[in-house]
């Protein structure tokens, strides 16, 4: 093995093998030469010359065969050596290592250490990148949380201001509406600059932008109208007695008769022709007529909506109602029947079952009546039972005092004025009619807005771009809506209201009180259940006692009839008494029954 590792190339090894083979052949030849003379001498001594020649030929054949066999063996050895060298080379390629003379594998150890170092470096890089990404993600989440915290604080402040009455969000303009107004103002400023420069292309472009902004503003205005037409807003306006102004200053300053003065000045300044002036005049008159129709419709709708609120939702005392109430002497408990005021009987349709509280009171009254009237005769008992059973039905005298009993036990009086001031139920048809009126009011406002847009588009078709730009600059130069001032006013008002409310004492907390109330309610519920069970048991006992009394009285009546039909003899009376006493043990023994037996003996 050491010879193979010390050799550097395979060629040198092959040369060495060849030299060994050459050395091996002369030795064999010498041995063969030594062997052949000895054999010849031996043959000469034992045999003749003829036999010696034949043996020599055979020996030559054997020698040739042996040489061939030896050559084959040498070739096999060479092949085995080559295979071993190839295996060693493959092992060195697969696992490169530098062997020392002692056989230690220092190369493999260094490779393992290098691999470990590489893996460690890769793991460190991966962990460093992960920590970096984690820090960035946490930082991003913290920033979002900070933004949300600021928004939450702002919303809390706004809610506090709303609770204190500092601002009404329903009246706050939409942010989109504010942006649209600011964009329109910027377009007007750019139109003024383009007019001064006499740039028609920029005028056309800016006018197109202005028309687009008006179309976008339509949807925003519709949302603002929905806020104003909301039932809560209309209820507040009706309660305050607010009546809106029917004349819109924006419309009257453009299409009204009072706007003729500045229109004439504009016609002369913009150099409008006679045909254009006639078309503008006709357009203004048509716009004014349509606006008058919309105003009349809006006035009727507003009046009917406020009447509904003041008659069906928020009923306030008026002179007419007070005069009628004093004239007819009406009150909450004795109002006339709305269907038949002069009738003397209550129909089943107007009577509704009473509340559980009323039934409990009636049951208590029944118990008291039964206990008080227990000592009366059978006829009185039967009449009292009938009266107690019919206590829920009103008598003709009670008809004038009862108008209607609601399902929940509350009184609902419908007086002669046609409305119910307490718990008045509204029909579904009335609610639907009222919603139609609100929808019509919303459409009225939207129609007025579309009328303005249509008038503006008609004017743009009549005028040239420069004339239209001059008109817009003149009209909108005097219009201004400062939203910053509005917000400042709202904030100042909120701070003033907050100072006023801080002077009042804060309301107490009701956490413990609510728990006590809940416990008290549970106790009351348990007590009412127990009372109802006791009342049922007492009613059952009373019914049994009444049945026994009826049977006892019937037996007494039969005895009296027998005594009246038969002649009165002492023996007969004793017999009747004996019969009575023999039949008396069948009655169940109770203090009430024993008390009823004593008068019969007398």
UniProtKB/Swiss-Prot annotation:
GO terms for molecular function: DNA-binding transcription factor activity; identical protein binding; sequence-specific DNA binding; transcription cis-regulatory region binding. It is found in: Nucleus. One of its GO terms (cellular component) is nucleus. InterPro entries: bZIP, bZIP_sf. Residues 1-10, 593-602 have a biased composition (Polar residues). It holds the Pfam family bZIP_1. The keyword Transcription applies. Disruption phenotype: Following starvation, development proceeds normally only until the finger stage, when extremely long and thin fingers/slugs are produced. DimA and dimB double mutant has the same phenotype. Residues 58-94, 509-552 form a coiled coil. Residues 113-176 form the bZIP domain. Keywords: Coiled coil, DNA-binding, Nucleus, Transcription, Transcription regulation. Residues 1-128, 328-401, 525-602 are annotated as: Disordered. Residues 11-54, 66-102, 336-350, 358-401, 525-592 have a biased composition (Low complexity). Residues 115-135 are annotated as: Basic motif. It comes from the Eukaryota. Gene3D superfamilies: 1.20.5.170. GO terms for biological process: cellular response to differentiation-inducing factor 1; establishment of protein localization; negative regulation of gene expression; negative regulation of programmed cell death; positive regulation of gene expression; positive regulation of sorocarp stalk cell differentiation; regulation of gene expression; slug development involved in sorocarp development. Signal peptide: none annotated. Belongs to the bZIP family. Transcriptional regulator involved in DIF-1 signaling. DIF-1 (Differentiation Inducing Factor-1) is a signal molecule involved in the differentiation of pstO (prestalk-O) cells. May be a direct activator of ecmA. This is Basic-leucine zipper transcription factor B. It comes from Dictyostelium discoideum (Social amoeba).
